[in-house]
Structures are given as structure tokens and as C-alpha cells.
């Protein structure tokens, strides 16, 4: 038992090490976002203030700051400005995501759409994106503008691809990976690559950080999707079975559908063909997930992407920042919050 606690402490320390290494700048990122979102429309003010108060770990912004530091960008405020851009893209996509999913809880708090409705959530999400693009233009770097605008388009396409395959029980792993690479990993990748651009690094180093971010993002999404069948609301701010009730076909269901017996497969097909799934449907699914040890298999798949993320950093010289980013790969899959 002691060794498990030590592992969890070590994993969570990887996140804290990252946070501590950029803590002074994260405060400035939050201030930048707050100032940029000021509006004379009272509802916009209320909704953006609530979004800031209930914000998450700011991990993507931290990755931009950390990657910039790794690549020698130490003076000037461009890293702060672009980390804020990355965070705004993320916040906007979450607002839109919650509308699509009819989400009511995120990070243990009520979602914006559950308080103010879908119409206002979509419009304020658009407002966040428009402010983000203003900041990108202010930065003035065409490469950054191309990268982040292309990333925004990729995220949207990933969401549409997921909608296209919603409730399709025979979705293959290749399609699943394409979805999460677009809707999640693309922003992780861009957040890291921005740091290499700011540091004026060559294409090899830019692509190395891009690859690191992409594989880290894939790992994070696999972890999130797996937690949906093995989660704790107090720790993770999400209720178990959310994806199941929404009819999303994620890695645990894909692997389960491949390995379970024909009768069980027929039951899964029936569940996902219905407009709504019940608590008993979820209980049956959780039982056979446990029966075939699906959670362990999902984490094993994620290990492959952890390895790819870590090895992407080998091209960089030894440094404290490199170690912090390498250690973060374990946090992505084994985190306890």
C-alpha cells in the first residue's frame, strides 16, 4: 500500500514541478485573459468570470511556458500572450463541447450551459475564440498564426468526426485515435510547438516538441476516456459513465466489443442503438469491462504513447525543464486529480 501512495505522490509531483517552474508566469497569463475578456455586456462578464473562477489546471498554457523556457525564450512577454491564446482556445472548445454533450458538470462544478443555456454558451465560446485571434494577430508571427488557426480547425473537425461515429459500436481503434488526435492532442501539440517557435529553434526541434505534445495529448485523452468507466467524482470532477450515457464510443468500449462473447456484443449493440441508456445498461457494461480487464488494457495502450512522448525529448540537451516535461508523461496517465 505504501508503494502505491509513493507512486501517486511522485506522479502528482511531476505536475507540481511543472507548475512551480512557470508559476510566476501563469499568474500573468490569467491576468492577461481576464483583461482581454472585459466586456460592457453584463452577461458576457458574468459568464467569462465564472469560467475563470472554475478553470482547470491550465496545463496547456503551462506547456507553452515550459516549452518556451526549454527553448531559451526567457525575456519578453510573447510566451505569456500565446499561452493565454492556447488557454482561450481550450476554454472555448470546452464550452462548445458541453453544449454538444448536454454536459451539466465539469471539474465538479456546474457547466456554463447548465446555468445560462446553450445559446449563450455557444456565443460566449465564439467570443473567447475571437479574442484569442485578436491576440494572435497582435503577436504578429505568421507561423504562430498559421499553427493556432489550423489547430482550431483541426479541433472542430475532430468534434464533427466524433459526432459522425456517435453510437457506432463497430468503430475501429484507428478512427478513435484520429478523433482524439484532432480534438485533444492537436492543441497539446501546438501548445508545445509554440515554445520552439518563440525560441527560434530549427524544424527538427519544433517537430520534436510537436510530437511530444501530440503523444502527451493522446495519452491524456485515453486516460480521460478510461476514467469514465473507472472514476471517482471527488477526485476527477466527473461522474462515471458520462460518455456511455452520451453514446460516445471510446477506447474501453472498442476493446470490449472486440473481446467479449457474441451475446455480450449483442447487448452492447442494443445499448448503443437506443436513444438513451439506463443505469442498468451501464452496470452490465461495467461488469463485463471488469470481466475482461479492459481498464488495464487501455492503460497498456496509453503506455505506448507515453514512450513516444518521452523519446521525442531525447534530441534536447539535458536540463531541468527537459526533466520536468519527461516526468509529466507519467502524470498524464497515472494522475490522481
Predicted features by range, described:
Residues 1-337:
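All-alpha prenyltransferase/terpene-synthase fold signal
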